[in-house]
Amino acid sequence: MKPEDYAWNEFERTSYKTKINRLPSPYKVAIWDDSEKRLELEQILERLPQKELARWALENSRDFLSLIDIGDEGEKNKIIRQTYEAFDARLRNEFSPHELRKAGFTANLLSKNAQNQIAKYAARVFVQAISTAHMRGHAIVSADYAIKVRNLQEVDKLELVRQEREKQIRLAEFFLGNEKYKR
């Protein structure tokens, strides 16, 4: 794929051109995980152009929106709606990376104002997904936060972690399959 499709950020584009991307990427979130499934996911995500990767991350975050609790459902929905609009504008190249980052900071209020740990990390799944429209590296962090939520929901349940990773992989394969048909 062309470097400009792979990454919109110059640093990530240069890493792609010089082939210095290493998988698996280091964890940025402390989680109990199936590292083989995570690597499998990353290998698929690596083949998606950034626009599709961002769409994948946002779609992957949808199941976690209902877990976000900031004590004010109206405010939560307003923040999510505004952030979605900024994300879509960025994908249409109508928003600069800076404007998207500002929207991401607003979305981060969902995490800061969370009423419990599950709500906090569910919000981070969403915030990192939105940020994928700025930098690719946020996609795997979003996916890892999804695993963090599953860790909190059921302590010591590796099967729940595997199910979540398999769901992420199926969704990524769907996006990869759709990308092939676009060409």
Regions found by a protein language model. Name each.
Residues 2-164:
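Structured binding/interaction patches within domain cores
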Residues 153, 157-158, 173-183:
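Mature, well-folded catalytic/scaffold domains that follow N-terminal targeting or propeptide regions
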Residues 163-175:
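A recognition module on extended beta-rich or small alphabeta surfaces enriched in W/G with H and D/E
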